[in-house]
UniProtKB/Swiss-Prot annotation:
The record's note on its domains: The Q motif is unique to and characteristic of the DEAD box family of RNA helicases and controls ATP binding and hydrolysis.
Species lineage: Eukaryota, Fungi, Dikarya, Ascomycota, Saccharomycotina
Name of protein: ATP-dependent RNA helicase DBP9
Keywords: ATP-binding, Helicase, Hydrolase, Nucleotide-binding, Nucleus, Ribosome biogenesis, RNA-binding, rRNA processing
Gene coding for it: DBP9
Chain ranges of the Helicase C-terminal domain: 260-461
EC supergroup of this enzyme: hydrolase
Chain residue ranges for the region called Disordered: 334-368, 546-581
Stored InterPro entries: DEAD/DEAH_box_helicase_dom, DEAD_box_RNA_helicase, Helicase_ATP-bd, Helicase_C-like, P-loop_NTPase, RNA_helicase_DEAD_Q_motif
Example GO biological process: maturation of LSU-rRNA from tricistronic rRNA transcript (SSU-rRNA, 5.8S rRNA, LSU-rRNA)
Residue span(s) of domain Helicase ATP-binding: 47-231
Length: 581
């Protein structure tokens, strides 16, 4: 649930907030956010959570109000808790999310619902970029709500094992948001450890929220749920009408060529989110596009968390129209063959556990970062899979960033045929070897869900005129230029991150001057590439040659200060020559 109102497709006009008998302070905050009616998932989950005290397992699409479905009951219970009203603070609720970006997003929403609570309820985000001293000082105040990634929470618990800073025995609510992503990020081991800290047998209410519900949830349901109510919002039909999916078969270099043509000629109207499979790939594409005057910004795990959060916020405010995001989840999902998993799901359980433990060790590197799922990118018109993901599940997560909350959207994926692999070494990518195999799985998976992915054929005759200058620009983006750009970007963002953390807290009006889409010039700057000659444009986009603009009948008069042309003797250089003795 974003801070804006949910889509009309998900709103339940037949129900009202008054029917839930919520605390007046909470109703006032909800009204201030502009939520006139609860969404379908909220209308189903909130009564079950408040009146029947049931555990909730909910499956609903992005933009349907899942966050509000668990945050609203949590805050209502805290506002009506006599212990909280008396000022006796204890940790009452744990909210677990897969990424730092999502934890910050949830905290912002919680704070907006607590605006009329008179500071009786405190909420903290453990996954924020805070020092141990700051975390300890926040925990000493016994916040009622803790938002964190599983790994960060376990880290804090283990560090303070012999201290009285954090005690989870008073917890009455556990929420795991984006459950499938939490599991795919390798947090299962952390959740198993968390079980020993929680009072599971003492009226612990659990919310498990996700866009998909599958067999992976059974283990968590057994561990944390006692009497769950499973809610499934059947919204595939409404989503199907809003999302259009295409794939285009292309060569390794033509990916860059087509990206240049698409963005330079503004073939996509609105904001675009481009996914690449590694950090170098993102900087190569950024440096390539910059030479044509196409401004874009980068989002990857190397950047400081404060900068990443600011980039997402500015993108949502329409400051940037083009964002290149590195989806590094492919690094560990590629090891798992989806087809084998479907065929032998119940076989080799012991070896599967071994693979899971090995996989989780590799995932520790990137567990705090994620953009393909959960992060609230608003009003994305198009998702461009510049590099095809390595699993059909990752594809679903990526395209879920567009056509959200009932709005229309498009997804375009570049697919590399197997015969084209390795022909252009500089533009090649190792994961592209499996593109056709992954595409078959994606088409199969989407057809099961009632979606259609259509092939798209670019008119290469129209594009061919841009090839020469594209090749010229691509040659300028060397590996050295990429390395220097990464260093330069990291230095800039470290400075920006420090400013965001300190100076801009006191001077929010100056925050607008901080931009993340500044040019990272390659070694060779070619300014002429920023202009597209008229002869390269398609005929429909060219200006009418007959319309040459206003041509005056008489030439302009000579400027007053301009010297007149010499005449007579002065005009002849031989006659005007003076010999000086």
């Amino acid at each position: 649930m974003s801070t804006t109102s949910a889509s009309e497709a998900y709103v339940d006009d037949n129900s009202s907030w008054d029917s839930f008998h919520l605390d007046a302070r909470l109703v006032q905050a909800i009204d201030q956010l502009g939520f006139e009616h609860p969404t379908l998932i909220q209308a189903s989950a909130i009564p079950l959570a408040l009146e029947e005290k049931r555990d909730i397992i909910a499956k609903a699409s992005t933009g349907s109000g899942k966050t509000g479905a668990y945050v609203i009951p949590i805050i209502h219970n805290l506002l009506t808790d006599a212990e909280v009203e008396s000022g006796n603070h204890h940790i009452k609720s744990i909210i677990l999310v897969p990424t730092r970006e999502l934890s910050n997003q949830v905290l912002q929403f919680v704070e907006k619902l607590l605006v009329y609570s008179n500071n009786r309820i405190n909420a903290i985000n453990l996954s924020a970029n805070l020092s141990d001293q700051v975390v300890n000082s926040l925990l000493m105040n016994k916040p009622e709500i803790i938002i964190s990634t599983p790994a960060k929470l376990i880290q804090v618990l283990e560090k303070n094992a012999n201290k009285d800073l954090i005690d989870l025995s008073t917890v009455r609510n556990l929420t795991i948001d984006e459950v499938d992503l939490v599991l795919s990020y390798g947090y299962l081991e952390d959740l198993q450890k968390l079980e020993t800290y929680l009072p599971i047998k003492k009226n612990l209410q659990t919310f498990l929220m996700s866009a998909t519900v599958n067999d992976d949830l059974n283990d968590l349901k057994t561990r944390f749920c006692s009497r769950p109510a499973i809610l499934k919002l059947n919204d595939e039909e409404s989503a199907q009408n809003k999302l259009i999916q295409y794939y285009a078969r292309t060569t390794e270099f033509d990916k860059f060529l087509l990206a240049y043509v698409i963005f330079k000629l503004n073939l996509i109207k609105g904001k675009t989110l481009v996914f690449v499979n590694n950090i170098d790939r993102g900087y190569r594409l950024k440096l390539f596009l910059e030479q044509f005057g196409i401004r874009c910004c980068i989002l990857n795990s190397e950047l400081p968390i404060n900068s990443r959060l600011h980039i997402v916020e500015e993108y949502n405010k329409n400051v940037y129209n083009l964002l290149i995001a590195t989806d590094e989840t492919n690094d560990f999902t590629v090891e798992k063959d989806e087809q084998q998993q479907e065929e032998s799901q119940d076989k080799k359980a012991s070896s599967a556990k071994t693979k899971q433990s090995k996989k989780s060790k590799k995932q520790k590197k990137d567990t705090e970062y994620g953009v393909s799922r959960g992060v609230d990118f608003r009003n994305v018109a198009c998702v461009l899979n510049f590099d095809l993901p390595t699993t059909s599940k990752a594809y679903i997560h990526r395209i879920g960033r567009t056509a959200r909350a009932g709005k229309a959207g498009m997804a375009l994926s570049f697919v590399l045929p197997i015969k084209e692999v390795g022909k252009h070494k500089t533009a090649s990518l190792s994961t592209a070897k499996k593109d056709e195999k992954i595409l078959r799985r994606i088409v199969k998976q989407q057809s099961k869900n009632g979606f259609e992915i259509k092939p798209y054929q670019f008119d290469m005759k129209q594009v061919e005129g841009f090839r020469y200058r594209s090749e010229d620009a691509f040659r300028a983006v060397t590996q050295t230029a990429i390395r220097e750009a990464r260093i330069k970007e990291l230095k800039n963002e470290l400075i920006n991150s420090d400013k965001l953390k300190r100076f801009f807290e006191e001077n929010p009006q100056d925050l607008a001057s901080l931009r993340h889409d500044k040019e990272l010039h390659p070694t060779r700057v070619q300014s002429h590439l920023k202009r597209v000659p008229d002869y390269l444009l398609p005929e429909s986009a060219r200006q009418d040659p007959k319309k040459i603009g206003f041509v005056p009948f008489h030439k302009n008069k000579v400027h007053k200060n301009r010297k007149k042309k010499p005449t007579g003797r002065k005009a002849d250089p031989l006659k005007s020559f003076k010999n000086r003795k």
